[in-house]
Amino acid sequence: MKMLSIEEELKNNSYPGRGIVIGKTQDGTKAVTAYFIMGRSENSRNRVFVEEGEGIRTQAFDPAKLEDPSLIIYAPVRVLGNKTIVTNGDQTDTIYEGMDKQMTFEQSLRSREFEPDGPNYTPRISGVMHIENGTYNYAMSILKSNNGNPESCCRYTFAYENPVAGEGHFIHTYMCDGNPLPSFEGEPKLIGIPNDMDEFTETLWHSLNEDNKVSLFVRYILSLIHI
């Protein structure tokens, strides 16, 4: 798979929607994740990320302008022991609760589908990072409608064992702007991951469309043994 520039991917797409990046730094010592949200409506744009425990949740920037909280207020990031869960919806809780009961990432998501926001039927994208005794692996998932048909749910899981230093994967909800919004297609995109968190954060934030970007979260976890 050809490695893509995350900067170019974002600059050339005015509305990828919500996106998850997971990977490993070039020096092989840190696990990396990033999550961003975008919005076109006032309700979607009226959000910020706030810390909650070891993770984050979305919160209305102006509570007076909050219209429908059902699909926009949730915890995108939660930590369960040596696992970090990152998603674009309340399936974060579904995965957390399932894995806490010894279910797998994939099994935990069996009870969920795409979001009920027809005609877009926004995909649910999710990721989990597992770090233990200096080893690291991660998985990503997308649950989406079958070409806009809400009667059929397509489920895809991508697992990455012993990921390569300096590489990561990027998945987002929409291929591009549109009406209805077209769901993401294909495998998560292979991208480069730098060593410096501030550099990566700046690259992501400044590459996102100025009119549509809302919030960005980036985390580097220093717990990998580089051999």
Give residue spans per PLM region.
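Intrinsically disordered, low-complexity terminal regulatory regions
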Residues: K2-T33
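Alpha/propeptide regions of enzymes that mature by internal proteolysis
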Residues: M3-L10, R57-D68, V77-D117, G186-E199, ...
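Short hydrophobic alpha-helical segments used for membrane anchoring or interfacial signaling
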Residues: I20-D27, S126-E132, V218-I221
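Glycine/small-residue-rich interface belts in oligomeric ring/scaffold proteins
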Residues: T29-V79
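Short histidine
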Residues: Q91-E151
